[in-house]
Amino acid sequence: MPDVHLSSSFAEGNTSEQNENDTFLSRIFGFHSIYNQLDNYQYYDPESQVGDSMIRRDGGSNHLLDSESDSDLSSIESSSSSQDQPPSIHANDIQMQPYEPPTQPYGEIDPQPQNAPIMTESAPSHGILNNGAVSTDEAQVQFRKTKTLPSFHTMYQRQARGRVFIPSRERALYLWANIVNMDEFLSDLYYYYRGRGVMNIVLGRIVDLATLVFVIGFASFLAWGVDYDKFLSRGQKSLTLSDLIIPHYISKAPAMAKLLLFGFAIYITLRIVQLYFDFRYKLSEIRNFYRQLLDIPHDDELMTISWATIVERLMELKDFNTLTSSSHYVNDLKSKVRLNAHDIANRIMRKENYIIALINKDTLNLGFEIPLLSVLNPILNTRAVLTRTLEWNLKLCIYNFVFNNQGQVNPNVLKDYNRNMLAKELSSRFKMAAIINLLLCPFIVVYFVLLYFFRYFNEYKTNPSSLIGLRQYTPWAEWKLREFNELPHFFVKRLQLSIGPANTYINQFPRGFLVVNIMTLVNFVAGAITAVLVVMGLWFEDEEHSFWAFELTENKSALFYISIFGTIWAVTAGSLATDTSSTESANSSSPFYYDPEASLRYVTQFTHYMPSTWSKKLHTAEVKGEFCELFSLKIVVIINELLSLVLTPFILWFKLSSQSGAIIDFVREYSVYVDGLGYVCYFAMFNFEKKDKNMMHDLNKKKKKSPSHRTKRDDIEEEEESDNGVPNGDDKMIKSYMYFLESYDDRERAARPTPKSRQLPRTRLPPGSISESTYNVDHILEEEELPQGKSAGVFGMINQFYKQDLGR
């Protein structure tokens, strides 16, 4: 029987097959698409693996009579002889049954039922004589034919895929003991924790698909399902909705629209199939793992338990896994997988740490000015045009190129002589993504305009000032403020705590007397007109006259102007409310001080961001403007997202394609190998040893200053800069380290040594070793040629950016 292609997540992939599956369609359908992973979909299915292992335990023979566990298969008589053998039946076709010990002594013949039909074949006898010798005589082999199975060829073939029932706890232990890709498993555990259980995850995905279907379906109905000519002709005085609906409007849609709707239907079908596979083979097994091994019986507890507690319980299971156990196989020289809080965060954040470093080291230059559209420059952040659309394209092009299918850094990227070839290939990826974005741009723009309209209209109707007065952090700020090894839920919590103090800091700066006075006048006039129209509508309303439909101007009724002036009044009132509240606070009995510098310092307690260029300038409007680029108005962020749908192809083609060489150089220079962990970002290891910093920054130091002009002060300054994740000296790495210890309660939990590190003496590595780390002392530098990961594409972009990040 051919092997099933839906392999387990713990089986290693074939490199050649993965390279062949790297097709154009696999790139189009995007991350985790069913097309991209159907041939190598990674499941947690211990039952099928146990069945195969039981067959191999019987000796691995495909011959039916060679299995000692099948004691009731046939009756053997040693009196007959023949050279013929029964047809060979593969072990995969044997039905799994519990083993029953024989009732007679081993080697004797069990009694033959009188009414049982006998089918005989000549085959060599393998019986055991009374003296213990193996009989080599040829015997007449008799096969007992069951009543339900008509023929010999189907006698021992299972009717369906046989599964061995495994108790829940043993199933979870089997899952944990047979992990091969630890990065993926830990990411699945964290995804389950952040998703708050299997039902919340599944329902969230269903809601996302339903939202996508509704937006496309409702837009199609409004475009081709309503007869607007009949409504505008006014030939009939009374019309209902049923009179305006066009029956079978899909058949009358343009051919291009039908093609797009057909592709959309296929995409939704694939997403549903993928959701089923994830629920059946991944989420269910992860839920069982949480319940049986992590002692979390209900998913509701995931909302109250901390991630640090889960990490602590996970570390207690390390001796049950052959990859992480250090108490067994003491003579095994193979590296063991490291498992503590720092290593778990490094595995989950392996890819994101590189993006954080790329942005904080200013390797990615995303500044983009539009000479012909200079009016948009105040709206766009010209220093860094990073939106969700561009961020998704960056991950698409970089992740699937730099990292392989196992989540490790591709060894080819770490070789100097491959630099030019890899830079050209990465540049080609950026240009291909630009072309695809340009082709899909018209459809994506329409989709996102409708999506934002449907989403924010209700919020605008309830609170019109919310879209103008509210602020949020931009995508560029999120990557700029994020620490190394900081998991998303820690980062979201930190940003949410900073929003209140950030608004307080911005509101302390004066808005300008001219703007405030004009807004006060507009608010008064709009409120007065709205009040008069509402009172007149209530006074003149009767059965014969309707003031709401009275046309104040041509084709514009009183209700229309009430909506317009009411909106203006609400927006201006919301903008003036901040100044009023600040004045009331100043006049209240409690002391209130206008101190922007102290307010910004309080904000930095949550953001951990205060560059050296802000020193002694915290009270200035210049610093306030730079901070507003990070903490921008919500309406500006939405406009940037819509404009980026058009600008992303040009940024990918002209900006990022020319920086592909710098990206390759950065990954090669700032990747360090850690024994038991693999290649990780240098800054994520929190290694503050001088020798490592000098080694990692050697090339940059040579470019900055020649050795003949170096002084001791220069060495100290450059050493301080090398500690940072950014060149402006804001101590990115040390802040990440301190916050990491704070997030995991204490130092012992975060950097708990493994049993191996407690037993072995601490030995110093040779100076300049790239593997030297505070958390690991015996590194073995080795290079593993792992299969290159599959590529993904941008077609999934139609539903990637409309949903907020989980938990935000």
Swiss-Prot record:
It is found in: Preautophagosomal structure membrane; Cytoplasmic vesicle membrane; Golgi apparatus membrane; Endoplasmic reticulum membrane. It is a multi-pass membrane protein. Homotrimer; forms a homotrimer with a central pore that forms a path between the two membrane leaflets. Residues 434-454, 634-654 dip into the membrane without crossing it. Phosphorylated by ATG1. ATG1 phosphorylation is required for preautophagosome elongation. It comes from Meyerozyma guilliermondii (strain ATCC 6260 / CBS 566 / DSM 6381 / JCM 1539 / NBRC 10279 / NRRL Y-324). Forms a homotrimer with a solvated central pore, which is connected laterally to the cytosol through the cavity within each protomer. Acts as a lipid scramblase that uses its central pore to function: the central pore opens laterally to accommodate lipid headgroups, thereby enabling lipid flipping and redistribution of lipids added to the outer leaflet of ATG9-containing vesicles, thereby enabling growth into autophagosomes. Phospholipid scramblase involved in autophagy and cytoplasm to vacuole transport (Cvt) vesicle formation. Cycles between the preautophagosomal structure/phagophore assembly site (PAS) and the cytoplasmic vesicle pool and supplies membrane for the growing autophagosome. Lipid scramblase activity plays a key role in preautophagosomal structure/phagophore assembly by distributing the phospholipids that arrive through ATG2 from the cytoplasmic to the luminal leaflet of the bilayer, thereby driving autophagosomal membrane expansion. Required for mitophagy. Residues 72-89 have a biased composition (Low complexity). Belongs to the ATG9 family. Residues 700-711 have a biased composition (Basic residues). The chain crosses the membrane at residues 206-226, 259-279, 518-538, 558-578. The gene is ATG9. InterPro entries: Autophagy-rel_prot_9 (IPR007241). Residues 51-116, 698-732, 748-771 are annotated as: Disordered. The keyword RNA-binding does not apply. This is Autophagy-related protein 9. Residues 1-205, 280-433, 455-517, 579-633, 655-808 are cytoplasmic. Residues 227-258, 539-557 are lumenal. GO terms for biological process: autophagy of mitochondrion; lipid transport; piecemeal microautophagy of the nucleus; protein localization to phagophore assembly site; reticulophagy. Its main location: membrane. Keywords: Autophagy, Cytoplasmic vesicle, Endoplasmic reticulum, Golgi apparatus, Lipid transport, Membrane, Phosphoprotein, Transmembrane, Transmembrane helix, Transport.
